[in-house]
């Protein structure tokens, strides 16, 4: 059984969901309206709360100030798993307490950097 933290798609809503879901081992964060779920999944609607979002942002700045830019890029992609990818990346970042962008052997980092590179490549096409 997964706990699906459903956000409104805003950055503040996402960071609030990260705050709420961080300790939940079965957490899945999404804003997709077309999410395929299992019968026993539990939905938790997350409304943006500025204080919770600011606490997450403050922690990320303390661990790795460049991670906020990377997370912004991840959340801008049209990928269906963008929120979960960013959440997994944040969870590893806070656990390691140091920048993790070079740990490409980890699947969550590899997927996050793939999405960051996609956005970077699209910017150059404009």
Place the predicted regions along the sequence by residue.
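A basic- and aromatic-enriched beta-loop-alpha substructure that forms the phosphate/nucleotide-
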Residues: 53-104
